């Protein structure tokens, strides 16, 4: 997203009780989130998500106590509903080749401690909208859901030492109808996502 848009959001942020920063990729996904929740809308994709969140955290006078990324995800296994992610990785980055080149481990995956009562899932993140059966089948061997920002958000949060939670709602089946399904699902699912976010916020405030 344009840097000036991020700066404007930064200037107007007001933290809630437990200093949670909420992050979504699009305005549509965040449409029903309460207006007093501190929110960054990053734009779609790994690069935009990384840039927007890093810029905010680097400039913040005080870091949030937790980052919650929420939004839609494609289903790789036919599941539906809202999930909390317990493991996320970047599916379009071949870390094994890098390991061979440098001769040492090059991790590509982050385990995330869960904090909600939602069902859990593994998430595959990449800079491509999954809508073909071959890619879907390949990713389904490692994850139940796929998106385009989750790993970037978790990676930046880890770098800054901030606990991170990923909440994802299934919007499509990552097949040849995914693009059309996603557009409809964003509007329909915004209310459900907002409800899950409010419930999680209340739970974290009681901890």
Predicted stretch roles:
Residues 5:
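Cationic, low-complexity basic patches in intrinsically disordered or flexible, solvent-exposed regions
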Residues 16-21:
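Extreme N-terminal starter segment of soluble prokaryotic enzymes
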Residues 26-207:
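Glycine-rich phosphate- or other oxyanion-binding loops that anchor nucleotides, phosphorylated ligands
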